[in-house]
Amino acid sequence: MYKVADIFCGAGGLSYGFSMHPYFELIWANDIDKDAILSYQANHKKTQTILCDIMQLNCHNLPCVSIDILLGGPPCQSYSTLGKRKMDEKANLFKEYLRLLDLVKPKMFVFENVVGLMSMQKGQLFKQICNAFKERGYILEHAILNALDYGVPQIRERVFLVGALKSFKQKFHFPRPIKTHFSLKDALGDLPPIQSGENGDALGYLKNADNVFLEFVRNSKELSEHSSPKNNEKLIKIMQTLKDGQSKDDLPKNLRPKSGYTNTYAKMWWEKPAPTITRNFSTPSSSRCIHPRDSRALSIREGARLQSFPDNYKFCGSASAKRLQIGNAVPPLLSVALAHAVFDFLRGKNV
């Protein structure tokens, strides 16, 4: 049994795959966000959670210092001033990550972040990060993974950097992509239609699971979190007017918003995967999140589905707190693939 810890754990998306694997044991998880920690506790009951700033973690308050695998990566803002003389508090988070690495001395770590990290400061920043890991005795492999290629009905690219101690002789191989891609229709087609301001929880599911994605997420007898915020009449009219894939630029002048980017006030595609889900997946003025069949933005259940969270996964806090946890998460299905790849490496399989 390999011991795992997760820092910047959020609601537990990256932990999910390791928690489901029979040879991994999640020992502890840390985050500074109270709602995220409550969500993590609700779904990973055997794991000890630590609610505090990462700077407060030390050998005295960690339930287990000896860890085999460390998961997590600091928020992308942490790197914006790295390498400059003046470091802000968020930039220090990466230094704290390195401190934790020195403290727990894991055999491996899985580090995740936005793809833009690789191009910051003309690529020099990513080199600095890699060098900091290499100085601690880790051999590195990195790749840009698209969650779409691992069963998630969403185009979502993130950079993953996996480190292993030099004592390992084999090379780490990232999980192979699968050939099947899922669309919004595949992922959401069993949910009842609702309109602006309506709650569809009592309506239940429309049909049985008819694809492997629905078989994965449909592990709850009752539908929950399937409600839509109430919008004003003009926004409802905008959403009614748009067709699949259209945005504000396709609207008649009397309805066209005067501000907003191209992908705002935009309808999703029913027969295509979702674009990247963010914390704003219920805010048409901030992202492409209008349902292709109903005149409304996505519900919390739909946002969670498009991230591949099972229907029985619990999110705590306000509606905005739940959206933040969902939008920031590593999709669980991607974490399942990563957990298997890490296990294969530890067992010396050259996949």
Give short role names for the model-derived ranges.
Residues 11-22:
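Conserved SAM-binding loop of SAM-dependent methyltransferases across substrates and taxa
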Residues 4-13, 54, 64-82, 108-114, ...:
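Conserved proline-anchored active-site loop of SAM-dependent methyltransferases
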Residues 33:
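Conserved SAM/SAH-binding beta-strand->alpha-helix loop
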